From Swiss-Prot:
The active site is at residue 2. The keyword Hydrolase applies. The lineage of its organism: Bacteria, Pseudomonadati, Pseudomonadota, Gammaproteobacteria, Cellvibrionales. Keywords: Allosteric enzyme, Cytoplasm, Hydrolase, Metal-binding, Protease, Sodium, Threonine protease. It comes from Cellvibrio japonicus (strain Ueda107) (Pseudomonas fluorescens subsp. cellulosa). Allosterically activated by HslU binding. CDD domains: protease_HslV. Protease subunit of a proteasome-like degradation complex believed to be a general protein degrading machinery. Belongs to the peptidase T1B family. HslV subfamily. It catalyses: ATP-dependent cleavage of peptide bonds with broad specificity. One of its GO terms (biological process) is proteolysis involved in protein catabolic process. The keyword Cytoplasm applies. This is ATP-dependent protease subunit HslV.
């Protein structure tokens, strides 16, 4: 699977992810880009789950962002509505972590939209390791959001066999 981690702190929101694509117990690719900028570089998004499914969701989410003038929450809710009513979407196995200058959201495979506590998002197979590391760093250090994401992903990659050390990190200042 993968690890995607997002942290918001001191006027920055950061989403980072590793690059490993696995098929069963085999590493198929080590440098996949699972974190992207969307809607005029104003929205960050990362995915965990099936790669083809995630690209389908990226496309649909980006279309919703365009049709709702970059309003992240509105676009996420509209995508979730589609997800629940469109039979082909209901079979997609992917999670999206999305963030802009105002909100951080998880869009789940069930069509749920969740705004996590403390604007900390961690999804994928290594998500819980990254989340634990990030939470400890948020509570006990003054590190900026980017450094917390870097360290959280590194720790997850050291522990989770489905997460590697090839990271893509995007930063949005606000």
């Amino acid at each position: 699977m993968t690890t995607i981690l997002s942290v918001r702190r001191d006027g920055q929101v950061v989403i980072g992810g590793d690059g490993q694509v696995s098929l069963g117990n085999t590493v198929m690719k080590g440098n996949a880009r699972k974190v992207r900028r969307l809607y005029k570089n104003q929205v960050l998004a990362g995915f965990a789950g099936g790669t083809a499914d995630a690209f389908t969701l990226f496309e649909r989410f980006e279309a919703k962002l365009e049709s709702h003038n970059g309003q992240l929450t509105r676009a996420a809710v509209e995508l979730a509505k589609d997800w629940r009513t469109d039979r082909s979407l209901r079979r997609l196995e992917a999670l999206l972590a999305v963030a802009d200058k105002e909100a951080s959201l998880i869009i789940t495979g069930n069509g749920d939209v969740i705004q996590p506590e403390d604007d900390l998002i961690a999804i994928g197979s290594g998500g819980m390791y990254a989340q634990a590391a990030a939470r400890a760093l948020l509570e006990n250090t003054q590190l900026d959001a980017r450094n917390i994401v870097e360290k959280g992903l590194k720790i997850a990659g050291d522990i989770c066999v489905y997460t590697n050390q090839n990271h893509t990190i995007e930063v949005l200042d606000y």
